Amino acid sequence: MPQSHIPVMLNEMLANLAPKDGEFYLDCTFGAGGYSKAILESCDCYITALDRDPNVIKKAEEIKQNYGERFDFIETNFADSFAKLKEKKFDGVVLDLGVSSMQLDIADRGFSFLHDGPLDMRMSGQGLSAEEFVNIAEEKELADVIYKYGDESFSRRIAKRIVEYRKTTRIDSTGKLAQIVRSSIGFRKGKIDPATKTFQAIRIYINNELGELERFLANVKNILKKDGRLVVVSFHSLEDRIVKNFFKENSEKPVARSKYAKDDIAIDPDKWLKIITNKALATSDKEVGLNIRARSAKLRAAKKIL
């Protein structure tokens, strides 16, 4: 049975975004609308939501009917959104980088190893599909992608098995790919499904998720108002590292000064962020018990000070 969509780290997101009446917020990853709806319900504010997945438009229309002019939706990838936002500025920006339950549970989207369907994995439906990639990529490229984006220690073994399998049969379904991976590794008691890391790796690669996160962060300063907050929920160590490093590189490191020092320290204009979360927040055991898909989530938040 499909799992209903449960927004991850919802309370932590609201606490760090701190929505207020009359303010404007940007939900960069609308999905099933969990974050947008929660922010709209928290106060009398306004939301612009983004998503490149055309399948979420119906859900966006439902929220629009309920909240009217307080809600606006733009069908676009967040990394390409700046021109479409037309110089709007926001009091807060939130990104939930995980694939939504809605995408995972629809077999035809090709994201899930639990539901057999066409091997697609494209969030926008455009560009190279997972089926095309696994059937044309060289063995070394397959291994590198699975290792880099999935942190899969058996990546070479899996890549070799994929290449052997496709010599006689095209890999055109999620079920076939999942079985190839499982047969390469074998099930280990008490561990996650062996196909988890490989599917994650191919999805991240196909959708250029890390590159688009970096591209968005490089421009987010331009759409945040002074004191505006940036909240990012990630599900992969590489995503979290990108966000962590971005916050660190753009924030002022606290300086220990003598109480006798009289001169003021000039503010570095390149250090425009103040980190709110000293370290990444993780999901509680209670939340993971209710939603196993939240187990790897991490939240970081920062505020624009210049």
Curated annotation (Swiss-Prot):
This is Ribosomal RNA small subunit methyltransferase H. It is an enzyme of class 2 (transferase). GO terms for biological process: rRNA base methylation. GO terms for cellular component: cytoplasm. It catalyses: cytidine(1402) in 16S rRNA + S-adenosyl-L-methionine = N(4)-methylcytidine(1402) in 16S rRNA + S-adenosyl-L-homocysteine + H(+). S-adenosyl-L-methionine binds at residues 33-35, 51, 78, 96, 103. SUPFAM superfamilies: Putative methyltransferase TM0872, insert domain, S-adenosyl-L-methionine-dependent methyltransferases. Specifically methylates the N4 position of cytidine in position 1402 (C1402) of 16S rRNA. Its EC number is 2.1.1.199. Keywords: Cytoplasm, Methyltransferase, rRNA processing, S-adenosyl-L-methionine, Transferase. GO terms for molecular function: rRNA (cytosine-N4-)-methyltransferase activity. Belongs to the methyltransferase superfamily. RsmH family. It is found in: Cytoplasm. The keyword Protease does not apply. It comes from Rickettsia felis (strain ATCC VR-1525 / URRWXCal2) (Rickettsia azadi). Its main location: cytoplasm. PANTHER family: 12S RRNA N4-METHYLCYTIDINE METHYLTRANSFERASE, S-ADENOSYL-METHYLTRANSFERASE MRAW.
